[in-house]
Amino acid sequence: PYKYGFGPFAGEIYRAPMSYPFREENPQITGKEAAERAILMIQKQIGADQVAAIIIEPIQGEGGFIVPSEGFLPRIAEFAKENGIVFIADEVQSGFCRTGEWFAVQHEGVVPDLVTTAKGIAGGMPLSAVTGRAELLDAVHAGGLGGTYGGNPVACAAALAAIETMEAQDLRARAREIEATVKGRLGALRDELGDGIIGDIRGRGGMLAIEFVKAGSAATTKQPDAEITKKIADYCLKEGVIILTCGTYGNVIRLLPPLVIGDELLVDGLDVLEAAIRANS
């Protein structure tokens, strides 16, 4: 949706299907099989020898906080390596302890050629970075990477302090604690409501989401319900809890609590979210 009204766009950019466990036509498809589906599209429509790079979010952000099935990322990375394709992980949303590891690719031991980061890298200060193999980054001529405000010393100092805090407070472990609390609470609510409006609960660490569907459709058509999602978000806002929606169909609520959040405040926020879901079920 973000490209609406913009253009023209750069040519020769192709989009391959992601692993989306909740909405796969075949619910039994494995991550590796989903990867082979994407690879087949690349081979048939483009040709592996014509691909310069593959860029992927290890966990899709605006697309709906989609965690691919286990095995998907390693197979895509393997395909890239086999064919001399640069494999780029977009960790702008998922990086720096957000998912319970420093980077989301680490959950499956994937090592990208390049990693893009921003957001969490500097604790809110404007900073982004590209990190990767020396042979790639050193190939760029002097001044070829960056811009007028590249390497801003204040933002870089903030990033160093933020990373030190992540290490000192072990925010990777804290992200995993948040995941356990949130999934436990929401999972119990879904079980109680039965075949209601909660279609899927997913995510890793402190990067979590709820996908809402029409009541009674979670196990069958999984019909997206953007209207109910907006009502829930509005309810939360009125009660002082700011949450954001995302997803292709606008039917996903994403939860991104600060990794330094205390248990009491986290539970307070979940209380409001649960009340909002109950009020709209």
Predicted features and spans:
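Conserved N-terminal phosphate-binding loop of PLP-dependent enzymes in the Aspartate aminotransferase
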Residues: 1-281
